[in-house]
């Protein structure tokens, strides 16, 4: 387990947390729509510089947190990976799909179907490589990463989970991993279900919204499976650990080194 110093992340986190949807720069993110169960849902997609249709491209599916839910197709760009992408648009090598969950929903049920429909739409429209599909999310979206990985084992080449969990936080009893059999340890069950999926887990040591203990327990369960798993905990960082997480220099080389067809 890695523990990183806070360095400049406190100031960056304050800036990130103060962002409002109305202030979001959408210039790097094209708007698209998908239909699920008779309803239209908007999502955003980032295309790397130099994208063309002559080859297939890796695709990252990003799941936002609870504060970015809605239907404006803008708030989903305000935290986490999208702001980081804006500053690294020139050299990020993958397509990024950014769905938006409706208010008062979580990343299971219809929002999960919608996110995967947006991913499928982007695979077809932007020549996605099905052996290089990646999944990441923060907070509620971190829960969503584990949910989608559990519901669709073998779909993704690697995942990155930021301040997520499996058990519900005190203020959101509906937010938890769905489908765990009664009486089963959720961490051991999930680790066995998704193996050998490579995972990098991030959490703030001072997080008082989603306890880091769940990430520690998931890390231990994946280690017990012998999987390629990393855990980075940021000392002194509260819930906004997505700022240092997505700025971790080794994250993207590690993620893109994995292919689904190379998993054991």
Feature annotation, model-predicted:
Residues 1-9:
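Bacterial N-terminal signal peptides that target proteins for export
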Residues 13-18:
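Hydrophobic core
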Residues 19-59, 136-138, 180-182, 216-220, ...:
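A domain-start/cap signature at the N-terminus of enzymes
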Residues 44, 59-63, 95-100, 132-136, ...:
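Structural recognition of the beta-strand scaffold that forms the well-ordered cores
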Residues 50-55, 104-140, 153:
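Gly/Ser-rich "nucleophile elbow"/oxyanion-hole loop immediately N-terminal to the catalytic nucleophile
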Residues 59, 63-118:
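Active-site machinery of serine-nucleophile hydrolases
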Residues 144-148:
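Hydrolases whose catalytic domains are alpha/beta-hydrolase-1, hotdog thioesterase
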Residues 158, 163-246:
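The feature captures the conserved acid-bearing segment of alpha/beta-hydrolase catalytic domains
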């Amino acid at each position: 387990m890695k523990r990183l110093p806070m360095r400049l992340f406190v100031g960056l986190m304050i800036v990130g947390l103060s962002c409002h949807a109305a202030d979001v720069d959408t210039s790097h993110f094209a708007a698209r729509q998908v239909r699920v169960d008779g309803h239209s849902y908007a999502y955003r997609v980032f295309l790397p510089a130099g994208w063309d249709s002559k080859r297939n491209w890796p695709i990252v599916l990003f799941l936002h947190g609870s504060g970015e839910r809605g239907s404006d197709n803008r708030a989903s760009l305000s935290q986490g990976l999208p702001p980081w992408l804006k500053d690294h648009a020139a050299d990020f090598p993958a397509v990024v799909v950014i769905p938006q969950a409706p208010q008062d929903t979580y990343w299971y049920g219809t929002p999960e179907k919608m996110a995967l429909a947006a991913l499928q739409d982007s695979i077809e429209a932007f020549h996605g490589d099905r052996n290089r599909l990646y999944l990441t999310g923060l907070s509620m979206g971190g829960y969503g990463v584990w949910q989608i990985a559990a519901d669709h084992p073998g779909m993704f080449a690697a995942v990155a989970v930021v301040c997520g969990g499996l058990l519900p936080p005190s203020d959101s009893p509906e937010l938890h991993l769905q489908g765990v059999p009664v009486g089963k340890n959720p961490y051991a069950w999930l680790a066995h279900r998704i193996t050998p999926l490579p995972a990098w887990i991030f959490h703030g040591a001072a997080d008082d919204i989603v306890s880091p203990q769940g990430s520690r327990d998931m890390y231990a369960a994946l280690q017990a499976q012998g999987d390629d798993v990393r855990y980075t905990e940021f000392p002194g960082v509260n819930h906004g650990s997505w700022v240092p997480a997505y700025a971790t220099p080794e994250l993207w080389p590690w993620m893109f080194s994995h292919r689904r067809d190379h998993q054991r």
